[in-house]
């Protein structure tokens, strides 16, 4: 009799605890429950999406070894951005991201960005300032990323002003050296002869790989270079210090370094959209817009598809993770269960200004979620 009273008490308590709507007949409770479930799922995904965007901002700065986003305005960027063929190629033919499933993986990617191309603008050195008869250009400071990587290509780009009639231009690149008493101040690097036609000016590239490698071996020997480009009448056509209307025509160095390919790991996962009712772990679309952050220092891409993982990992779906399942069986209360996380990620290529106003083209690993799974 006492047991019966206990059962009745429990039953009454359950009736009181249940929402009154749930006791009515009809389809309305089911519809409300489904709507509530969808609403909760949308809220959860929205929170996950916001967290993912904030995490991406932190990861980009960390992987680029930047303590904070470079403070470069759009006006300054217009002045610094070279109007040169190699840079225009990177922007015009920009590969925002690779959808190839064999490209990179979370386990095999390094954490920090892999530099592929560095565009270095000229600066003034103390040696150039102290010289009598200031040379026409240029001193280049090199990033530590160049010093610790193998250089596969190094080109000096110079812009030659337009000519009014067909003419031959004599280009000479000289390397500055410390003079011994009355000795020479320069040694030749490259000399070439160009035939120019009337019209707009042209960009000319010159191979300086050997010189750069010597500078990297002996940094103290890097005192700068001088650029000369005279036509038949002795007019200097090289833009070394841009005048009015010559923004973006500075000489610059384009340096390419090796990039070690990464092995990938194949996996399978679910893909969903924002209207999906899928409750299992799934990959959802997410576009990151750098312009919305005010990150003008990122030249390209202005936005990219990052994606994110969301929803649940139930133990009933864990045949793929026997170790996790066994842990749960052994200690069901102590196990927090698996989480829906990226199981495969791929890099993005990025063209950006670093804190020293150098233009870097590199690969940032693990920035695009390719697949999601429970782990």
Swiss-Prot record:
GO cellular component term of the entry, any: extracellular space
InterPro entries: Cystine-knot_cytokine (IPR029034), TGF-b_C (IPR001839), TGF-b_propeptide (IPR001111), TGF-beta-rel (IPR015615)
Positions of glycan attachment: 71
Record localization: Secreted
Keyword Secreted tagged: yes
Signal peptide: 1-23
GO molecular function, one term: growth factor activity
Positions of the propeptide segment: 24-266
GO process terms (BP): muscle cell proliferation; negative regulation of myoblast proliferation; negative regulation of satellite cell differentiation; negative regulation of skeletal muscle satellite cell proliferation
UniProt cross-references to CDD domains, sorted A to Z: TGF_beta_GDF8
Keyword Transferase: no
Keywords, sorted A to Z: Cleavage on pair of basic residues, Cytokine, Disulfide bond, Glycoprotein, Growth factor, Secreted, Signal
Disulphide linkage map: 272-282, 281-340, 309-372, 313-374
Function: Acts specifically as a negative regulator of skeletal muscle growth.
Quaternary data: Homodimer; disulfide-linked.
Protein family: Belongs to the TGF-beta family.
Protein name: Growth/differentiation factor 8
Encoding gene, per UniProt annotation: MSTN
